[in-house]
Amino acid sequence: MCIRDSIGLYRNEQTYEPVEYLCKLPKTKNKTVLVLDPMLATGNSSSAAIDLIKERGVKVKNIKLVSLLAAPEGIKNLRKNHKDLHIFTCSLDKGLNKKKYIVPGLGDAGDRYMGT
């Protein structure tokens, strides 16, 4: 059975750090948890989400991160903070620009999703 719950984070554009606005997670200690991050840039938001999941007793070996597009910086950050994390991405781009967006990238995933 699949249980879907949510962690809502957005990036503070001045500090580039994640800000949590929603956390609705069940206790799923022995389940596999998929973290979906469409564009893995700095890895800060994904790392914060994984920390919240780990606080609920889930072991890193049971967490899988899935992204469409990733930057090397984000993968490095996740590896540093969550050594045994499984990371799956469709494509690895060059890196990040000054605003910490993936280049060449696809733009802002949240803006695209929300149509803004």
Put a short name on every predicted segment.
Residues R4-T116:
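PRPP-associated nucleotide enzymes
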